[in-house]
């Protein structure tokens, strides 16, 4: 559907460009015919022609309407940004000359209808952090089902998988309300069982985060070479993928799973992998390549001396590195 929509809009824009090329000639022919048929109104016709917009739109009502929308939209910064996100390349691998799209929309917030209340200055929480939260879970009729203060690792899903993902991105002291779709009411605990045929309302307050190693969104740039409206990867889910780490200062490749011939099999939130891996995978749709620019310190593991990807000693912690993730297969 996404490719079809992109194709339709591309065709409309190309159609409009063609009309821009040929409309001056059509205007001249029309002017000559009008002048020959009625010489007495030459001055009036000329004045009318000079006052007309330079673009002449032909076709049926639908074509003219869509063309006007495209033209007017491209005159604004918002319109240009819209088409930048819609008219994306449909190729797979990235290289520096390819066109990529900066990721602006958090699909996870949309999926869970998350609303954030209050503010905090410690965080944000990432998949793999140990958090202490107070939560309330109700049915859609606001009947309270479960209420507790609990400490757990994000991604372990001791209550329900959806709750872990609602907490991602929170600051200590913030509160969130969300709706957990039935599919994400599953958990890894035998103590709390939710019926996965129903949606649930969740209210949660974040009380603490450990360890206090954070990925700040303003220090990281994330780009995708393809976008699609699909269910994204979530904290606690398993995925296979290829990863490549490049040092931006000299182009040296520090790690390349494809060159090794061995894909990475990872549960998002596994603290034996670099923190930036879980951060980048959270909310990713499993198509195309995701490119992440971040400092070397974010490639350290979260509270573990074991790093399955790259040794801490070889990491240039204060330099920016490029991480490329692709060839996704969700387990």
Swiss-Prot record:
Catalytic reactions of this protein: [protein]-peptidylproline (omega=180) = [protein]-peptidylproline (omega=0)
Domain PPIase FKBP-type intervals: 128-226
One GO BP annotation of this record: protein folding
Region Disordered, annotated ranges: 33-54
EC number, as in UniProt: 5.2.1.8
InterPro entries (UniProt xref): PPIase_dom_sf (IPR046357), PPIase_FKBP_dom (IPR001179)
Pfam families linked: FKBP_C
GO molecular function: peptidyl-prolyl cis-trans isomerase activity
Alphabetical keyword list: Isomerase, Rotamase
Protein name in UniProt: Putative peptidyl-prolyl cis-trans isomerase RC0542
Species this chain originates from: Rickettsia conorii (strain ATCC VR-613 / Malish 7)
